[in-house]
Amino acid sequence: RKERHRYQQGDLELKEAITNISHDLRTPLTAINGYLDLLEREEKSETVHCYLSQIQNRTDVLKNLTEELFRYSVVTSFQELKPERMDVVRALEESLLSFYAVMQEKGIQPEIELPEEPVFRELDAGAVNRIFSNIISNALKYSDGDLSVVMDKNGCVTFSNTAHNLNYVTVGRLFDRFYTVEASRNSTGLGLSIAKLLIERMGGSIGAIYNNDKLQIKIIFAK
């Protein structure tokens, strides 16, 4: 019992630390971006322009990491979700549309199969959008050039893509907090763990299957 209490206390302290760190980083990052915008308007040599471009890129990465940490701290704070009757088909369509530019840039032509009729569920709209966005973002990040999204009439959604850089071990850890497939500092490894936490809080489930270099992530929303 003491061990459990110690674990819960440690987990609470970790969440508080993440919240504080992400919050403290947001203000200086906003200031840095402001100064970079001002410098972009000044005349400068090609070398200085190159340096500024690198600084901007790394600042954007840090900003994205900070925002992801902040979102994670919000999700794990167990703020009350607000279920409402919503069309899951439309929510998925909107999420896919928001990634259209990224897909174009990567040369990915997604194969999409959605029900013609709406699929209504009592869900938190913001949480559903976050779930879809995190899964699509992850799929595009590690895809070898393809993406398939299929939803059946019961609202079960399957995201599939070829991913030669994965294996059964990495797939088994995809939903772990802070786990990243690559030893990269460009990701916190929280995207899929946030998706899992949110969907389970709404009574649904999520899982991953890896077979013949194909990754499938399937989510089922509670009826």
Task: Give the ranges of each region predicted by the language model.
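Conserved catalytic submotifs in the C-terminal HATPase_c
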Residues: 84, 109-119, 154
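A conserved beta-strand-to-alpha-helix junction within the catalytic ATP-binding
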Residues: 84-97
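Short helix-loop "hinge" at the ATP-lid/N-box region of the Bergerat-fold HATPase_c
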Residues: 139-140
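Short beta-strand/loop element within the Bergerat-fold HATPase_c
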Residues: 146-156
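Short conserved segment of the HATPase_c
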Residues: 166-178
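Short alpha-helical Gxxx[C/S/T] motif in the catalytic ATP-binding
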Residues: 191, 195
